[in-house]
């Protein structure tokens, strides 16, 4: 049995950060990861030609100071997401090309409705206390309704409704009917509002990392060194008055405390002895992840740029719901990323890969022309079926969950502590939130031990 000061379960950005900060503080650590790689819900693949592809989380934006601090720590630069040229909105088969945030070529009524709803969402999200959204003045009311119901009652134009539902529900990779309005407002608020949540320039997708997210998580793992143990899915955590014992199939770790830094759906698969408190157990049962495909399509060059397009497009109901330019800072080859979320992701998952590819490429030809039909490579990542992700990219709260069980998100259960982007009060749902949660949990366990030994 390996004996250490602290054990960390999960080597995504939350777990890596927690283990790194503990080790830097002079503590002994064992970091156990179920996969044969680190990164969690981020995953950078480097092709034979040296081009890197982010198959998971990829962007950084304003206010995401903790992931940027890690980038600075390891000397990793970023570059701006490509936004030159026109974006495209496809509604009822008609293409609207536009600059800025809203396609002004749509009817004035639709544009006005979009703007009004955006403004209202921004005002509502400002009322959410980030550390305790369940204490908001209207928490009970908002937690009793779904995002879908709220949009239906507050969006007068069908095109505006469909666009907003696609954009907002996509953030939770689930149908809007599955997501609590309180949770949606909380997640918006944690990032600074709906403009940040959905924005590219100066928003959540403002910049990309040179070399991909792997350029950050690889040196973190290297510094953690032989304290990192891959291919060790944790099956059981026992705690007693003196510490915890964490067990995988062929490894046991004894520690004073453990940080569980895996998605909520995966944390629910671990056996805890004694059982977790009821509220935490019920939280595990009630915060699912969604369905998402992230498909990177590689071309000789980003031909859409020559055609005056940014590569950004959105088409409610389409099997290629959202696209964005994912080319590297080298500008060649061109990479177009297709993101498909929620019910549509589940539906295209029923196709075989060849049919899915034909369907996606046909959609892209309709938007970007015949050149889109002949890629060099087609790389799809289905996070829905990732064994140790449990879906993607964020666990969401259905109605009633935050007001009943929200306080259990961060509350330690004896010697078991929790990390992961869902537990972050700031930037919940982003890589930055994962980093923040790891730093918080590392500080928390060390502080608890100082108090217990004082």
Question: What do the PLM-derived regions correspond to, one by one?
Answer:
Residues 4-31:
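N-terminal Rossmann-like FAD-binding beta1-loop-alpha1 element of flavoenzymes
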Residues 5, 17, 25, 99-100, ...:
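Conserved flavin/dinucleotide-binding core of flavoenzymes
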Residues 7-9, 32, 234, 252-266:
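Short hydrophobic core segments
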Residues 23-48:
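Glycine-rich FAD pyrophosphate-binding loop
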Residues 51-123:
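Dinucleotide-binding Rossmann-like beta1-alpha1 core, especially the glycine-rich loop
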Residues 129-233, 240-243, 261, 271, ...:
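Active-site/ligand-binding neighborhood in enzyme catalytic cores
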Residues 238-253:
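Conserved beta-strand-loop-beta-strand element in the redox core of flavoprotein oxidoreductases
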Residues 260-278:
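Flavin (primarily FAD) binding-site architecture
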């Amino acid at each position: 049995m390996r004996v250490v000061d602290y054990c960390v379960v999960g080597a995504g950005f939350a777990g890596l950060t927690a283990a790194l900060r503990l080790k830097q503080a002079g503590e002994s650590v064992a970091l156990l990861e179920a996969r044969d790689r680190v990164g969690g819900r981020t995953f950078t693949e480097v092709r034979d030609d040296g081009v890197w592809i982010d198959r998971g989380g990829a962007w950084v934006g304003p206010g995401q100071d903790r992931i940027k601090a890690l980038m600075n720590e390891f000397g990793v630069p970023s570059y701006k997401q490509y936004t030159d040229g026109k974006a495209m909105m496809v509604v009822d088969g008609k293409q609207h090309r536009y600059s800025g945030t809203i396609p002004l070529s749509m009817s004035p009524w639709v544009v006005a409705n979009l703007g009004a709803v955006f403004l209202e969402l921004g005002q509502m999200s400002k009322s959410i206390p980030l550390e305790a959204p369940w204490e908001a003045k209207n928490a009970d009311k908002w937690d009793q309704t779904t995002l879908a119901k709220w949009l239906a009652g507050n969006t007068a134009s069908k095109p505006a409704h469909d666009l907003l539902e696609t954009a907002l529900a996509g953030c939770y990779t689930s149908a809007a009917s599955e997501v609590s309005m309180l949770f949606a407002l909380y997640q918006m608020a944690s990032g600074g509002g709906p403009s940040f949540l959905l924005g590219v320039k100066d928003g959540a997708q403002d910049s990309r990392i040179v070399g991909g997210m792997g350029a950050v998580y690889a040196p973190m793992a290297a510094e953690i060194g032989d304290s990192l143990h891959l291919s060790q899915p944790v099956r059981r955590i026992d705690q007693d008055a003196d510490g915890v014992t964490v067990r995988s199939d062929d490894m046991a770790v004894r520690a004073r405390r453990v940080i569980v830094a895996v998605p909520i759906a995966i944390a629910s698969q671990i056996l805890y002895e004694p059982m977790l408190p009821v509220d935490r157990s019920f939280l595990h049962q009630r915060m699912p992840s969604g369905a998402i495909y992230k498909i990177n399509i590689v071309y000789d060059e980003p031909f859409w740029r020559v055609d005056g397009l940014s590569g950004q497009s959105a088409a409610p109901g389409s099997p290629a719901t959202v696209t964005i330019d994912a080319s590297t800072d080298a500008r060649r080859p061109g990479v177009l990323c297709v993101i498909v979320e929620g019910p549509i992701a589940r539906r295209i998952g029923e196709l075989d890969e060849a049919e899915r590819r034909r369907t996606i490429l046909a959609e892209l030809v309709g938007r970007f022309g015949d050149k889109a039909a002949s890629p060099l490579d087609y790389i799809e990542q289905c996070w829905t079926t990732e064994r140790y992700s449990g879906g993607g990219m964020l666990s969401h709260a259905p109605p009633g969950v935050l007001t009943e069980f929200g306080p259990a998100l961060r509350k330690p259960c004896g010697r078991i502590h929790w990390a992961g982007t869902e537990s972050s009060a700031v930037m919940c749902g982003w890589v930055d939130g994962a980093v923040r949660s790891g730093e918080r949990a590392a500080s928390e366990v060390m502080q608890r031990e100082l108090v217990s030994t004082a």
